[in-house]
């Protein structure tokens, strides 16, 4: 369910002609129908979260189509015009290079880059935020950028939780417990849920849950008997915090609300919100 302040609401898009209106309405309907509580202080925060999710999906598909290569950290490579490859296989932003330009280059010249799936997910998150921020703001927040697995910038605020309901734009993890040690990079797959039962994972592409599990199962030890599976771990950008940096020139999604209850008591412990 969706909560704005203390009101449980059912939101709907009022302008059906705005970009990705159908996709945004689908996301709103999923969130409103889920048992998980999605709590926002204002309607603008919800609008930011909605546009962020859409841009995460767009960025995932753009990265998929960019020619970006799958490589282990030992084999990783990057465009030396913008990045320096570290000894561990990460990408360190060169001095005096704006992070916005360097992130955009990954999507423009994907064939000049190769790394593993976790780093790819963080790149998608950065690109989605860049779509909603002024470049000056993005460059200030993410100066001295390092792209290396989950070692992301401290100003990128993420929420990771176990349990909850899947929403398009979520980052979820497939685990392969009996992976073949010879191909340890396939011990799991970080993916973006695109909606309509499809996921994007760097290395596996755009596939259904069943297809990703099949792909991981093909990389298990001989005589393996435990299947790969989709875990209940969900990672999201903390839109309540990151929305404060949004560009004032970014068009807001026009949302109206059908009130359901306006006296809810909202309690949050960790990353779990409960309604009384």
From Swiss-Prot:
Q: Where are the transmembrane segments?
A: none
Q: Which keywords describe this protein according to UniProt?
A: Acyltransferase, Sporulation, Transferase
Q: Which InterPro entries match?
A: Gln_gamma-glutamylTfrase_bac
Indicate the enzyme's highest-level EC class: transferase
- Gene Ontology molecular function, alphabetical: protein-glutamine gamma-glutamyltransferase activity
GO BP, one annotated term: sporulation resulting in formation of a cellular spore
Enzyme Commission identifier(s): 2.3.2.13
Catalytic reactions of this protein: L-glutaminyl-[protein] + L-lysyl-[protein] = [protein]-L-lysyl-N(6)-5-L-glutamyl-[protein] + NH4(+)
Taxonomically, the superkingdom here is Bacteria
Among Pfam families, the record links this protein to: TGL (PF20085)
HAMAP family listed in its UniProt record: Tgl (MF_00727)
Homology family:
Belongs to the bacillus TGase family.
Instruction: Briefly state the protein's biological role.
Output: Probably plays a role in the assembly of the spore coat proteins by catalyzing epsilon-(gamma-glutamyl)lysine cross-links.
Q: What is this protein called?
A: Protein-glutamine gamma-glutamyltransferase
Species of origin: Bacillus cereus (strain ATCC 14579 / DSM 31 / CCUG 7414 / JCM 2152 / NBRC 15305 / NCIMB 9373 / NCTC 2599 / NRRL B-3711)
């Amino acid at each position: 369910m969706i909560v704005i302040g203390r009101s449980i609401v059912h939101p709907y898009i009022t302008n059906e002609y705005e970009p990705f209106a159908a996709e945004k309405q689908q996301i709103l309907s999923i969130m409103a129908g889920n048992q998980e509580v999605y709590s926002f202080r204002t309607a603008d925060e919800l609008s930011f979260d909605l546009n962020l999710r859409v841009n995460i999906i767009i960025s995932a598909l753009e990265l998929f189509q960019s020619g970006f290569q799958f490589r282990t950290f030992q084999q990783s490579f990057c465009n030396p015009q913008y990045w320096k490859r570290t000894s561990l296989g990460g990408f360190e932003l060169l001095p005096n290079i704006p992070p916005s330009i360097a992130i955009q280059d990954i999507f423009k010249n994907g064939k000049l880059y190769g790394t593993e799936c976790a780093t790819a997910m963080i790149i998608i998150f950065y690109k989605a935020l860049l779509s909603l921020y002024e470049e000056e703001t993005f460059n200030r927040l993410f100066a001295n950028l390092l792209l290396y697995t989950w070692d992301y910038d401290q100003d990128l605020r993420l929420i990771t939780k176990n349990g909850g309901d899947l929403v398009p734009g979520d980052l979820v993890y497939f685990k392969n417990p009996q992976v073949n040690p010879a191909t340890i990079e396939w011990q799991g797959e970080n993916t973006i849920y695109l909606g309509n039962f499809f996921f994007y994972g760097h290395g596996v592409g755009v596939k259904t849950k069943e297809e990703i599990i099949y792909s991981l199962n093909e990389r298990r030890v001989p005589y393996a008997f435990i299947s790969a599976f989709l875990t209940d771990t969900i990672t999201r950008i903390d839109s309540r915090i990151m929305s404060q940096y949004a560009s004032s020139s970014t068009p807001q999604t026009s949302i109206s609300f059908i009130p359901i209850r306006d006296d809810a008591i909202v309690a949050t412990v960790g990353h779990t919100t409960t309604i009384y």
